[in-house]
């Protein structure tokens, strides 16, 4: 009985590359959907709420409050919109390339986190480039906190997820090296 010939290694490499590229396109689609959601919410707020107007969203938790921000998070660097716009553009291009090339995104979770940061950077970049400021609308009513938008949620979620994942995997690697060192030879 004859055995089937083994698949040449280059074929499996090509299949893995093809699968990776497919997932990369799915991440780009997810980023595009997140940017679209961000822009739709911002457009709705700009068209339906006066600047400074507040409306309940989730009672006793969060309200829609129309404000604009020429700076970064918590209005930092509000006199340097041009610099923030440039940095956002560079970051957006870098993250697109990072996903495509596989830089520091070794698995699906890290790819998701980078996709979220990409979407947030691109969403706020669109506002800065088009209007010179970013529309913010979500305001916690139960505590004093900065007003934020969908893009900000994406950036913060992606950064926290990626940082947590990196710390967790580093912790696991450190402990596995310790266990290997303690194992009798």
Language-model features, listed with the residues they occupy:
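Alpha-helical transmembrane bundles and membrane-interface segments of multipass inner-membrane proteins
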Residues: 2-185
């Amino acid at each position: 009985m004859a055995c089937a010939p083994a698949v040449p290694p280059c074929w499996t490499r090509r299949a893995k590359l093809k699968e990776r590229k497919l997932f990369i396109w799915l991440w780009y689609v997810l980023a595009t959907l997140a940017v679209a959601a961000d822009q739709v919410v911002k457009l709705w707020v700009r068209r339906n709420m006066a600047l400074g107007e507040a409306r309940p969203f989730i009672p006793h938790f969060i309200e829609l409050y129309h404000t604009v921000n020429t700076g970064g998070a918590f209005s930092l660097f509000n006199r340097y919109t041009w610099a923030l716009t440039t940095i956002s553009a560079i970051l957006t291009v870098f993250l697109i390339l990072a996903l495509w090339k596989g830089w520091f995104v070794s698995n699906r979770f890290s790819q998701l986190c980078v996709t979220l940061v990409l979407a947030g950077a691109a969403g706020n970049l669109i506002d800065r480039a088009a209007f010179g400021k970013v529309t913010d609308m979500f305001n916690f009513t139960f505590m004093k906190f900065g007003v934020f938008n969908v893009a900000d949620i994406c950036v913060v979620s992606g950064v926290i997820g990626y940082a947590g994942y990196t710390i967790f995997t580093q912790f696991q690697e450190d402990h596995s090296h310790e266990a290997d060192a303690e194992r009798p030879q």
